[in-house]
Amino acid sequence: GISAKTQLSKLSTGLQTAAKLVVALNVNANYVFLDEPTLGLDANHRELFYKELVKSYQEKPRTFVLSTHLIDEIQQLVEYVLILADHQLIADADVEEMLDRAHTVTGPEKLVDQYVAGLRVLSTDQLGTVKTAYVYDQLDDQRVIPDQVKLGHYDLQKLFIELTNGGSKNE
């Protein structure tokens, strides 16, 4: 543990972060802003923080604004996302709505290209004759999916990466 007499500046980065988080989670405010809150914490302590964040929210519902690069770790915690790239707001939406638009389309190159025509394709990967398109768009129920083409979804971190890389040359 941390002695009450120990100066914050004498602690390791991880312990400084932990001490600051204890204060942040116990502050009586309607909005709590946390910039890279898990900086210096190992995986176990990050997980503990996320659990304490949820517990704190359940005890006193309020808005937590998190700025983080560890998107995969917070995906299950967040309801709403703002994504900034080059000082520009590029996404401002409910997480569930965003993920409902994040699709992978995989199959033979020609069939994938035909299927994604007219859709917002953020990027593509290709391995031999198999192509994967990362689509960020609503898929029309009228689109016929060829048997050789598989649809899937991707997570918030992959969507963040694709959106902040400026979209695709395929748009």
Range-by-range predicted roles:
Residues G1-V65, H69-D72, Q76-E79, A85, ...:
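ABC transporter nucleotide-binding domains
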Residues A24, Q114-Y115, L159, L163:
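Residues that scaffold the ATP/ADP-binding catalytic core of kinase and kinase-like folds
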Residues V27-N30, P108, A117-R120, R143-Q148:
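Short glycine/proline-enriched coil/turn segments at helix->beta-strand junctions
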Residues V32-P37, V112-Y115, L139-V144:
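Short, surface-exposed beta-strand/loop "edge" segments at domain boundaries and coil↔beta transitions
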Residues Y50, L99, F160-I161:
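Conserved protein kinase catalytic domain
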Residues V54-V65, H69-V135:
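ABC transporter nucleotide-binding domain
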Residues S123, L127-E171:
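C-terminal coupling/interaction segments
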